[in-house]
Amino acid sequence: DINKLDQIIAGKHTSPAYTMKSFSNTPFLVEESVFSTYDDFKDLLEVCFATDKDDLIASLKDSGLRGRGGAGFPTGMKWEFCKDQEVSTKYVVCNADEGDPGAFSDRYLMEEQPLKVLFGMVICAYIIGSKQGFLYIRGEYPESITITNDSLAKLRELGLLGDNILGTGFDFDMNVVEGQGAYICGEETALIASIEGRRAEVDVRPPFPVVEGLYKKPTVVNNVESLAAVAAIFKLGSEAYKSIGNGRSLGTKLISLDGYFNNPGLYEVDLGTPISFIIDEIGGGFNDDIKALQIGGPLGGIVPVDILKTLTLDFEAFSEGGFLLGHASFVCIPKSFSAVEYAKHLFAFTAHESCGKCFPCRLGSVRGK
């Protein structure tokens, strides 16, 4: 707020308190008591190492986990595709380039629950046969980078990362790559190009990264929340995990509510939760007159208030409505703000952030602006 600039400079202005809480019947992602210590990490790793890899894949597929970064592709199927590639060198990549305005779920997990994310990477590497992983973390998240590096160092010290993990003969290590500030790097092929030191441009698919990804080798790319959810599945069991949700979309989802809510913050909810419940009961209603919500980032779609009354938080409902769930960031558009001006802003954003490779985006975003 420009009117409070003097207060901010003087350090007298305080931002509204943000809440982190789970509203799920089976909390995991924001619940430290379930899985948060290095002993938890070791114990669950030992259980997984004693289980056949095909059984682990079957459990992951049975859980119904789908990518939490936007596309919603079945995670178990992605890992299985990569595992089946008969190539000696494979990679695991964590997409932590959280660039959607209003989204901070990935940042929360990396700074408050890093072991859940790192466990997902280690067990993915074990299943697909990878020896090297990369965490591509948004450059604007210095604390996330520091905490992740500290956690990696501790895992190496405890023998939970590096050579011969837990005496199993399994070797795996990972490194942090600092993002370069481009929104397009949130797209998996552009992210891969950035890790390789190339210009961050999207690649034509197929081949998909699970067949030909980083350095032209089979690669699993998952976002932060997807990897953290893997730890939940192997900790709670696939039956318990898939019992959460509405039968179509399973498990829990982190949502980010902005400052137009009376209770702004980050919350864990069951997929299938009515948006009206999120607004009224979790968010405490709005503190201003709102005309619409931008959910899932600048490309996720604008949801009018009247549609919110019947919409549920799940992949199918959003797809049927022509929206994209994405990171499930809730950005409010007040009635006092012109919808035309907001649309212009979105086109300007996409025109600025487009990598320029594909002409519909390169030309369309500029014309829209």
Where are the regions that the model predicts?
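Feature of Fe-S/electron-transfer and energy-metabolism proteins
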Residues: 1-369
